[in-house]
Amino acid sequence: MSNRKGGGGAGDYQEVIESLRRSQLIFEEDENAGPEIPTVVTSSSSASSQRSSASQHHRLNNMVVGGGGRDNEMSNNQNGNTPSVTIPSQCQVMTPRISSPSSVMAPSVTVTSGTVQQGKTFARIQGSSPSNTTHSTPTVAQAMQSVAPHIPIVGAGADDSSAEILSVFECPVCLEYMLPPYMQCPSGHLVCSNCRPKLQCCPTCRGPTPSVRNLGLEKIANTVRFPCKFSNSGCPLNFHHIDKMDHEELCEYRPYSCPCPGASCKWQGALADVMDHLKKVHKSITTLQGEDIVFLATDINLPGAVDWVMMQSCFDYNFMLVLEKQEKYDPAQSTQMFYAVVQLIGSKKEADNFVYRLELSANRRRMSWEATPRSIHEGVAFAIQQSDCLAFDTSAAQLFAENGNLGINVTISRIDGQQRRHPNESDAVDVEYD
């Protein structure tokens, strides 16, 4: 396309063309077909006579730029010359005629002083085609939707953008992911709810302690899927912030503490390493095989707090049997209590598949307790504190003891789904006297 110089009309012409290009209207040139484009001239008679003598015709991306003077219509030269068009300050873009029986007319875009009025639809115009194809005209909303980015749920993948957004929720103190509610300092710095009570000032800017709630960030957190706290240990799951803490309490990838009671062992490790740790470090613990065994506690009359521990292996699982004697202080008097409980070296889900029974039997008397084993995550301390186990005082212990030794019959059974009891459901202690 060549530009012709002359008069102010050419400048307006160039201004309109550049305005259309800046408005991102797409015009594709078809070099094989299309109508001839009228020559653009100025409104002066001298410029019109000079340009009417030229026989060269131009194409402008299959677009006809039309306009009229006062009556807004084209006038053709009666001498057979190329029709002339006067370009005013306003013009209208129209689609070209397609060399086929049917023609397509797209909605127009009104251009005023080099700007596009967005109140009308715009057309994505393609070159002419030999087939009778009708091209649909998308609206502005449809065109905006076609180029809008698809925003994934944050945390569902491992791409860089998700990691960058998740980094906003990292606590600067413990480096864990913060969960709602979010509190920020006047400078906008955040800290998690676990670390905030321990701080005297903002750890980032040393300003006042974060105390302003950030409601906007909480709305964003509702769209984020946070990885499990133990993802570095192998957990592949991501959770909404409401479900994250509940999962982490029972996550099988969380580190396991040493289950041996009464010891100051601070060991932590994977579930598969617990038994190796007990055999190497706590060598005094004895392991018996079978579903029915006798747990013999010796020297139960020793003063002070004492505990007895042994292992029972059955159903390809390992169970820890614990008997503890503790001082129970009462305002009236101080008494000693015995607590017996069974713990599975496994998760809570696995523990729900078993039931254990403890029984004391001697001198024509019988005392029994039946319940679901505690998991290694739950431990035995809480069960003993709540007396959720076989509990009896020293007077009852003497009824079943012989020469200071107390034998407890332990039976472990596997149950199916129908027989499975509620986690908090246990049998009461049965005491029988023959």
UniProtKB/Swiss-Prot annotation:
Pfam family, one: Sina_TRAF
Pathway as given in its UniProt record: Protein modification; protein ubiquitination
Biased composition (Low complexity): 43-55
ZnF RING-type: positions: 171-206
Cross-referenced CDD domains: RING-HC_SIAH1, Sina
SUPFAM superfamilies: RING/U-box (SSF57850), TRAF domain-like (SSF49599)
One GO BP: proteasome-mediated ubiquitin-dependent protein catabolic process
Root EC class: transferase
UniProt region (SBD), positions on chain: 220-415
Catalyzed reactions: S-ubiquitinyl-[E2 ubiquitin-conjugating enzyme]-L-cysteine + [acceptor protein]-L-lysine = [E2 ubiquitin-conjugating enzyme]-L-cysteine + N(6)-ubiquitinyl-[acceptor protein]-L-lysine
Polar residues bias spans: 74-88
Region (Disordered) location: 27-88
Role noted for this protein: E3 ubiquitin-protein ligase that mediates ubiquitination and subsequent proteasomal degradation of target proteins. E3 ubiquitin ligases accept ubiquitin from an E2 ubiquitin-conjugating enzyme in the form of a thioester and then directly transfers the ubiquitin to targeted substrates. It probably triggers the ubiquitin-mediated degradation of different substrates.
Family, per entry: Belongs to the SINA (Seven in absentia) family.
Comment field on protein domains: The RING-type zinc finger domain is essential for ubiquitin ligase activity. The SBD domain (substrate-binding domain) mediates the homodimerization and the interaction with substrate proteins. It is related to the TRAF family.
Protein name: E3 ubiquitin-protein ligase siah-1
Species classification: Eukaryota, Metazoa, Ecdysozoa, Nematoda, Chromadorea
Gene: siah-1
